[in-house]
Structure formats: structure tokens, C-alpha cells
């Protein structure tokens, strides 16, 4: 239906924040319209991470908005390059029984994008080794809420492991929780 309205293939281009600009100074006109090959129509350069945004949109039909952040706790946990196990049931909000950590690759590369796509299998959020986090949702608000929740989970995980090895919820318990969170915040 979208192409018939003359809008073309919406997954061939995206709106993304510019590279190197402080978020608290962004204006509407600073947002960069970028095509899937990285071409853009302004003097501002798109974020170097446009590639993995594009690939998430292409591979995850339910991704309508993406939040990528170098939030302090997620970045700290990501520096260990390990998945976060089900130490808390809220892990399920990301869509699985753990928070996956994408393997490290240099920022802005196809390799990083591929690693993120692998880590997002059956999930809506992941850590990016030695980098930060990425989360997506059906709109910007839900993507941002999930990114905030992932940051909270990482903070809790840091505090938990200070006390030793946490008790990990079983796969069967996480299956029950995953079923329950399908309708979380849906009224």
C-alpha cells in the first residue's frame, strides 16, 4: 500500500541523529534523512551507526523505532562481552531468557551490524560488546522505555554480582514469564 501512495519503499531510507552533535542541542532540522547505502541529503553526517539501524529495520519487521545508547551501566556490563543471565524476571522484556551481548566489532562496520542482528535473534534489545546497548520498539516511546529498562537491569546486575553469583531463574520459569510479558503494559 505504501508504494501505491507514491512513498516508495520506506525501508530504503531512515531518519537518524547526526554524528557528533549533542542530543540536548538537537533541533528538528538536524535530523538526517539517510538512504540504505549511506547517502544523505544534508551537510550533517548521519550517525556512524546508520548501518545497524538499517539492518534492524530490514530484519525485524516489528522494529519501528530504535534507540542506541552508551548508557553507563549497559556500557560497563558490555565491556565484559558476556550475556546477562536471567537473574531477574524483567530480562524477559527484551524478548528472551537472557540479554545477549553482540560480539565486538569496530563501530560503523557491517561486521558490527551483523553481530547485533545475531544477538537480537528473538529479542528486542541487546548489549554491544565494549560499546553500549541497542533496543527497538513499535514506536519511539516503547524503544526508549526498553532502553531505559535495559540500563536499569544492567545497574541491578552490577550490584547483584558484587554479592557473588546470583541465583538464575530456570528456563521453565522464564518460559512462563515470557508468556506473561507478551501483554505487559497493554492495558
Label every model-predicted segment:
Residues 9-67, 74, 83:
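An anion-binding catalytic pocket shared by soluble metabolic enzymes
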Residues 24-25, 74-78, 110-111, 136-137:
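Short acidic/glycine-rich loop or secondary-structure boundary segments that cap or lie
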Amino acid at each position: 500500500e505504501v508504494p501505491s501512495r507514491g512513498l516508495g519503499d520506506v525501508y530504503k531510507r531512515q531518519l537518524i541523529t547526526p554524528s557528533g552533535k549533542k542530543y540536548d542541542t538537537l533541533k528538528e532540522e538536524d535530523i538526517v534523512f539517510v538512504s540504505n547505502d549511506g547517502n544523505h541529503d544534508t551537510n550533517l553526517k548521519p550517525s556512524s551507526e546508520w548501518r545497524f539501524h538499517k539492518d534492524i529495520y530490514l530484519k525485524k519487521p516489528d522494529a519501528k523505532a530504535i534507540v542506541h545508547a552508551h548508557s553507563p551501566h549497559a556500557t560497563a556490563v558490555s565491556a565484559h562481552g558476556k550475556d546477562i543471565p536471567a537473574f531477574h524476571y524483567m530480562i524477559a522484556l527484551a524478548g528472551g531468557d537472557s540479554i545477549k551481548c553482540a560480539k565486538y566489532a569496530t563501530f560503523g562496520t557491517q561486521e558490527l551490524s551483523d553481530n547485533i542482528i545475531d544477538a537480537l535473534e528473538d529479542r528486542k534489545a541487546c548489549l554491544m560488546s565494549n560499546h553500549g546497548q541497542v533496543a527497538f520498539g513499535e514506536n519511539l516511546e516503547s524503544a526508549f522505555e526498553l532502553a531505559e529498562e535495559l540500563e536499569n537491569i544492567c545497574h541491578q546486575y552490577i550490584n547483584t554480582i558484587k554479592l557473588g553469583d546470583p541465583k538464575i531463574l530456570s528456563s521453565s520459569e522464564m518460559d512462563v514469564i515470557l508468556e506473561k510479558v507478551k501483554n505487559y503494559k497493554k492495558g
